[in-house]
């Protein structure tokens, strides 16, 4: 029994740690179970090894103590020299502390090196950003490398500098050679006699010197006096002319009647449109009453109580509250206060609030709360969140994963630019929430065997008014007809439509309408500025932009363009002028687009309307509209990239005559809201100078574009080579894959793309150059002639022979033949 107790005590003393060899320990434990004799033998071996380890540790400890004592003695010796008598007392105290350490007494106090970690919430508050990409997600974008404009510009500038230095060296060498030749000539001429026969060698005060000079000076003095008299007469004459002009103006103003102001045709059209919008059809109003759920009437007391509510009062689970605290969300915004209780009840919602008011959290929080109570036996995808752009989907994915940090809810993002195979592998695990763009969602829905939509219970459409436009109509209909009809549907946007005919398509069931702010409102903290371009100065628009970016708004600026081609050209000009800029449009991937701007490496983000919706890029101070957008709704989304979540911001729009309608709508909405609106005046001469600088760089821009095109072609060729190698190497596997299908033909996709472009940039945006160009008079006449022939019923056109024969008074050849046949 005694031996068994000793062995038990020895086993209790032995503690498994991460540094121990687990395999050896497991083998020893297995050997212990073989028999009593084997167990005793193993126990003795273990004791022996432990004693050896303990002795080695004690020796090491003793060595460390000796080293420490030696160091302390040296320090104390130095202190004795400085302090004198106080040193021995300190030495005794140190020795007492060492004895206590040797005894190994534990007084229950925490080690000073111990750090308490609250689970990462504090760290996440500091570093939270909607654009943050986790380490695991960084490699999902593929190995595609884009052409770097900055590299091309820096290479070209380095070449130019080297060439300039070489030219300067050559010039210097030439000058030195010329100088040396001149010196040689001077040396050769040094021995020659100089003839001063024709020169005046008298002193200046000598007789006859300076006579010509005095005559010339007298003449110049006389001329100056005449000029002064003439200028005085001119001044008097100009004063008289001015007085005469003023008298004429007064007489004219008395005789002529005052002209009445005439409205601009665009103003008349915009007023008519606004009147039509304000007068809501009675039939439409009846439709809305029947379609939407009745709204609850709230008293002022209940409104005050709602304003004071916090997230704790929604009875949310502790993991959700902890996630909200982790991203520093303490009090809900108005849209969150209204949405969360209704969404938790499972009702359909149509929500609208100004940009930057927290709409993403308004639908993510109730979804997470409902998913905490899901059955966990079988993994199932229950939620689909659809976004119009991949950048917005990536941002929503990052926000949702941050809020769900302390839960077991899984997410998947299905967006373009990421590997299809990796997305399919994640879908096999049936994630709870799928955040996707419509195109990639349909692709997986049709072609991924592991993805099923039969179990979806919640559908969210963010930026729903954009999703309901013609460009997304076909894709949205395909999704809505495939997923279950018995679902909860939530629609959110800053400019949410309430047209019943559009909302019926989504399959809403008596939705609750949650309109927090008045329609077409901006944030209160936003200052709106407008720079007016006079007629005939539209070609100087780039000069105004360069002045604004170089002199006034120099950091954290988003510049919006209508077309990515123009954005790319301005990006090159910015690079040549030394302005650090990044691009964000459909041809760029998300990593290329925002990473430099988010990290502060680029001061300007040149974007199209792709980035105007929903994107929450941290610290944006200013938004500049290079051109006013197609509609007031797009303008609201653009300027909503700044002044978010209560922060201040500024929006500046460069507006010409064609932009009058949008500018007037923005000013009218801002004044009704009480927002600050200002007009910025830029001197035309300053703008012209910057425009001239941009024109000087036109050739350089073309060369950079051609070099970029060449690099893209090389990259494309390399990709084709790699593709060919893979086809040869993995031929069997590639041929065994089923062909990916789509619900539309290429013609239908092209038509949908045109409709989407027309929604953003007007009817002319989707047209080709041939369709856009103006018809010549010759073409117009040809079209008129063809129309007249069709109206007259004559389907043929007189040929050259017919016209010539009619001029000569002869019948056409065919008619002659017919006449001869008739005579016979």
Curated annotation (Swiss-Prot):
GO terms for cellular component: cytosol; nucleolus; preribosome, large subunit precursor. PROSITE patterns: DEAD_ATP_HELICASE, HELICASE_ATP_BIND_1, HELICASE_CTER, Q_MOTIF. ATP binds at residues 353-360. Residues 137-166, 285-305, 739-749, 767-790 have a biased composition (Basic and acidic residues). Residues 1-305, 739-824 are annotated as: Disordered. Belongs to the DEAD box helicase family. DDX27/DRS1 subfamily. ATP-binding RNA helicase involved in ribosome assembly. This is ATP-dependent RNA helicase drs1. It comes from Aspergillus niger (strain ATCC MYA-4892 / CBS 513.88 / FGSC A1513).
